[in-house]
Amino acid sequence: MTEHTVKSYGEELAHLTAEVTRMGGIAESQVADCIAAIARRDGPLAQAVVAGDERLDTLQSEIERKAFRLIALRQPMAVDLRHAVAALKISMSLERCGDMAKNIGKRALILTEADPMSALTRSIERMGKLVQGRLKDVLDAYTTSDLQRAIGVWSRDEEVDEHYNAIFRELLTYMMGDPRTINACTHLLFVAKNLERIGDHATNIAEIIHFELTGEELTSQRPKLDVLSQ
C-alpha cells in the first residue's frame, strides 16, 4: 500500500469518527431540548425537537453508507475494522436516541395542554439530566478513546433504572389518588420510559467503545433493576 493510499485510508477513518462525533452532538442537543420542553412546557421547542429528528436520520444514513464503502473497498483488519464497525453501530444507537427524543417532544406538546404537575415534572427533569450526562460522557469517551470513562458509564447504568422505578411508583400513586391525572401521568410514564431507553443506548455505546479499543466484550453482567419484578 503506497504512502498516499495509507494517508487517504487514515483520513477516511478519521472522517468517519468525526461524522459520528457530529451526530452525537446533535443527539445531545435533541435530548437536552426535549427535557427542557417538558420542564418549561415549551411547545415551540418541543416542535423543533420533533422536526429536528430528520437531521439524525440523514446523518445515520450517510455514516452507514461511508462505513460500508470503507469496509468493502479497504477491507480493514483488526483495530481498523473495529473502528469502522464501531462508527456504524454507534450511529445506529444515536439515531435511536433521536427517535426517543422525538417521542418525548411529541408527549411534551400534549402535556402543554394538560394541567401542570410540577412535582412529577421535576422528577422527570432530574432523570433527564442524569441521562443527558450519561450520553455526554460516553460520547466524550468515544471522541477521546477513553476506555475508563466508557466503563464508568457502563457500570452506572443502574442509576438510571433507579430513577425510572421511582418515577413509575410516583406516577402510580398519583393515578390511584386522583383518576383525573391518569391521562397526563400516562404521557409522563412514556417520557420516563423513553429516557430510560436513551440511558440504555448510552450503555450500549460504552460496550461498543470497549470492544473497539480492546477487541474484547464486556463480560460482566450489566447491572439492571426492574420495578415489575420487585
Swiss-Prot record:
Pfam families found in the cross-reference section: PhoU
Subcellular location: Cytoplasm
One GO cellular component term: cytoplasm
Signal peptide range: none
GO terms, molecular function: protein homodimerization activity
Gene Ontology biological process terms from the UniProt entry: intracellular phosphate ion homeostasis; negative regulation of phosphate metabolic process; negative regulation of phosphate transmembrane transport; phosphate ion transport
Keywords, alphabetical: Cytoplasm, Phosphate transport, Transport
Keyword Transport: yes
Family stated for the protein in its record: Belongs to the PhoU family.
Functional description taken from the UniProt entry: Plays a role in the regulation of phosphate uptake.
Subunit structure and binding partners: Homodimer.
Name of protein: Phosphate-specific transport system accessory protein PhoU homolog
Organism: Caulobacter vibrioides (strain NA1000 / CB15N)
